[in-house]
C-alpha cells in the first residue's frame, strides 16, 4: 500500500487540489474512503484499516475522480436509507455565490447526480456560507449542518464564525433547503 503522505505532497491528481480531506466509513462493506479536493475536482482513495496507507481499488487504481456537477471544494459524505449523499461547496469562497449543494448516488464511487442547494447566503445576515460538516444523532432522524460564514458587512476574508442549523429531509429523502439564522439549533 502507499502512504497517506502521497496525498499531501502537493501532488495534483485528476486536477484536484490536495485540500479538504474527509474520511467516510461505509459500514456495509467496512471500508474507509477519503474524499478530497479543490479547484473543481474531487478524488476518492481507499484507506487501510489503521489509516496509514492507501489501498488500490479492484481495478488497480489508487485515485478515482468523483466530482459532481458544479463542485468546487469541501467534500462531505453520509449514507441514509441506502443512498450516498455527497455534499460540497460551490462558487468562490470569498464571493457572493458560495453555497453548499448535494448530489446522490447508489454507490460511494458515484456517479453523483446533483440534486440542488442546501445552504446559500443571506446577505442581510451573513455571506460566505459554505464549507460544512453534517452531524447525525445516532438512531434518530436528527441531522445538523455545521458551517462557516462571515457576518453581514464584514469584508475581511478570513473573519468567519461557526454556525449550525437543523437539516431535514422531505418524504422522498431529498434535503430541504436550510435557512441561515442567528439562533442556530436548540440546546
Segments from the language model and where they lie:
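Structural motif
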Residues: 41-48, 95-102, 154-164
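Short loop/turn segments immediately following beta-strands, especially the blade-tip
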Residues: 45-55, 103-110, 168-175
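Short, small-residue-biased leader/transition segments that mark boundaries at the very start
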Residues: 1-8
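Conserved blade-ending motifs and adjacent loop-strand segments that build the rim/top face
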Residues: 114-137
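Beta-propeller fold recognition
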Residues: 153-187
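Hydrophobic core segments of beta-strands in well-ordered, beta-rich domains
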Residues: 13, 20-45, 75-92, 135, ...
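Surface loop/turn motifs at the tips and blade-to-blade linkers of beta-strand repeat domains
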Residues: 12-15, 65-69, 124-125
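Loop/turn-rich, solvent-exposed surfaces of beta-rich toroidal or solenoidal domains
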Residues: 70-113, 119
Amino acid at each position: 500500500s502507499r502512504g497517506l503522505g502521497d496525498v499531501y505532497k502537493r501532488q495534483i491528481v485528476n486536477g484536484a487540489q490536495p485540500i479538504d480531506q474527509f474520511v467516510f466509513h461505509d459500514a456495509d462493506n467496512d471500508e474507509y474512503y477519503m474524499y478530497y479536493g479543490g479547484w473543481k475536482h474531487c478524488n476518492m482513495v481507499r484507506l487501510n484499516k489503521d489509516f496509514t496507507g492507501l489501498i488500490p481499488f479492484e481495478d488497480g487504481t489508487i485515485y478515482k475522480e468523483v466530482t459532481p456537477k458544479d463542485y468546487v471544494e469541501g467534500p462531505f459524505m453520509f449514507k441514509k436509507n441506502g443512498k450516498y449523499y455527497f455534499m460540497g461547496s460551490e462558487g468562490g469562497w470569498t464571493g457572493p455565490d458560495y453555497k453548499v449543494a448535494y448530489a446522490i448516488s447508489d454507490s460511494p464511487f458515484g456517479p453523483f447526480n446533483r440534486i440542488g442547494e442546501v445552504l446559500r447566503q443571506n446577505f442581510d445576515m451573513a455571506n460566505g456560507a459554505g464549507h460544512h460538516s453534517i452531524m447525525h444523532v445516532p438512531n434518530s432522524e436528527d441531522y445538523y449542518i455545521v458551517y462557516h460564514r462571515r457576518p453581514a458587512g464584514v469584508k475581511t476574508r478570513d473573519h468567519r464564525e461557526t454556525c449550525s442549523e437543523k437539516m431535514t429531509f422531505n418524504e422522498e429523502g431529498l434535503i430541504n433547503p436550510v435557512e441561515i439564522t442567528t439562533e442556530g439549533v436548540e440546546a
